[in-house]
Amino acid sequence: MNKWRLYYQVLNFGMIVSSALMIWKGLMVITGSESPIVLLSGSMEPAFHRGYLLFLTNRVEDPIRVGEIAVLRIEGRKIPIVHRVLKIHEKQNGHIKFLTKGDNNAVDDRGLYKQDQHWLEKKDVVGRARGFVPYIGIGTSLMNDYPKHKYEVLFLLGLFVLVHRE
């Protein structure tokens, strides 16, 4: 392989990565949410299955409603939780707290919250589901189950892009 072909392959790979990054950042601006999220468990079945890609919005002015699918970042947990808003508790001063539950879970999420926390607040919401693509994120779900294979797949994809000829 001559150096110009290698240069072309590296440049092509860079364009693919930068295009994906621009699309991602554009969606962040439009939706007000950091990124789409992949469901990693079956706790929201039958509405959403493991591997579904959820598109989120997180507009501050939108009130939280019972029945909405919320993506939550719980203090002390690395992976966000995707569950439905079960109950809302509103104080006289307008401060809202809420309780969540996975559709496929027998009990509410109080066992998942940090110790002595019984309700969530707006600050815990990463986004709210507004759309989905079925099973497109199953690869991400599998990589989460088998983390050591993540690096093998990334290496093979990078190698394929560099070696692939057009």
Swiss-Prot record:
Active site: S43
Entry's Gene Ontology BP terms: signal peptide processing
Cytoplasmic-facing ranges: 1-6
Disulphide bonds in the chain: none
Record topological domains on the Extracellular side: 25-166
Catalysis performed (reactions): Cleavage of hydrophobic, N-terminal signal or leader sequences from secreted and periplasmic proteins
Keyword Transmembrane helix (UniProt): yes
Segments passing through the bilayer: 7-24
Keywords carried by this UniProt record: Hydrolase, Membrane, Protease, Signal-anchor, Transmembrane, Transmembrane helix
Membrane topology classification: Single-pass type II membrane protein
Any one Gene Ontology cellular component term annotated for this protein: signal peptidase complex
Enzyme class: hydrolase
UniProt main location, coarse: membrane
UniProt similarity note: Belongs to the peptidase S26B family.
Function (record text): Putative component of some signal peptidase complex which removes signal peptides from nascent proteins as they are translocated into the lumen of the endoplasmic reticulum.
Protein name stated in the entry: Putative signal peptidase complex catalytic subunit SEC11B
Record organism: Homo sapiens
Name of the gene: SEC11B
